[in-house]
Amino acid sequence: IHESGHAVAALKVEHADPVDKVTIIPRGFYLGATHFLPEKNRVSWWKKELYDQLVVLLAGRAAEDVFLGDVSSGAKNDIERATQIGRNMICEWGMSDLLGNVALDDYKAQQLYAGMGGGEKKYSEETAQVIDKEVKKMMDDAYQKALSIVKENRDKVQLMTDMLIEFE
């Protein structure tokens, strides 16, 4: 169900890369995977492309929620990646309507200096709270869109899941 959610969402949003391969065969730490084949080399991303990436990343969990009535820890990597994209959109790429066109976070520098006495925030606690709210809102909106896509395409998600089980 999880991987089918990703794949169907990618087919339904406007700005996702085409699905190349879907597998439910466990490999390493992953129970399955959905691979995409970018149509072009990218140096930068449009906001609408990044938002659709969030939707696709969260659609696996949305499919679990819709079909199984519960969610698993299997979406850990999807959530981490989506959260990082959302945070970059807000803090590094100025894609927040509330915070505007400013770079608020030098996240990589903070990681580099972690434990070395450096890496303090370059903004107030109030701004940090706004960042957290903006990232959460973006993630919540993307998850709601993923849920809608899965619910509206329940038959396609089920068919894909059945085919993966039968042919893999």
For the regions a protein language model found, what residue spans apply to each?
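Soluble catalytic regions of large protease machineries
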Residues: 1, 7-168
